[in-house]
Amino acid sequence: RPDVYKRQVVQFNTAHKHIQGCRACDNCFSKENKACIFNDDFNELASLMAESDVIIFCTPLYWYSFPTQIKAAIDKFYSFIIGKKDVPIKECMLLSCGELEDPHVFDGIVRSFELIAQDRGWKNRGHYLVNSVNEKGGYFKYRTSTKDI
């Protein structure tokens, strides 16, 4: 395949980062060209987003939605709107797992994901959801090759 098809994958693990919730101060990109004037790890993510064409949300399900750590980062996407900054992201996907057997427990996170994709104008490449995951690392028992996703 030509080099144009080679991809670099960067993992940004919000669970191990310090990202404060958005304060809606509307001072985005006003200081040192940083996405958020409150200097936390979101600025690192914003820099990565400014160079990415795809974003994949990979997260456990917490109470029918995104966990706080990734939700804080998603809320700060607001900075790109206020700062009138375009990101080259064109496509997105959701990967999630949850403890309960009922597949409907994913309805909330899937709908939130769909609305994010619609709002940002990203092509929704779908979702891959795994229920009945009861222990740390349990998701990997169900994982298929990325060709299947």
Which residue stretches match the model-derived regions?
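N-terminal beta1-alpha1-beta2 submodule of the flavodoxin-like/Rossmannoid cofactor-binding fold
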Residues: 2-80, 118, 124, 137-149
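Short acidic (Asp/Glu) and glycine-rich catalytic loops that position anionic groups and cofactors
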Residues: 5, 129-130
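Short, glycine-/small-residue-rich phosphate/pyrophosphate-handling segment
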Residues: 68-69, 83-127
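Active-site rim beta-loop-alpha module in soluble metabolic enzymes
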Residues: 131-135
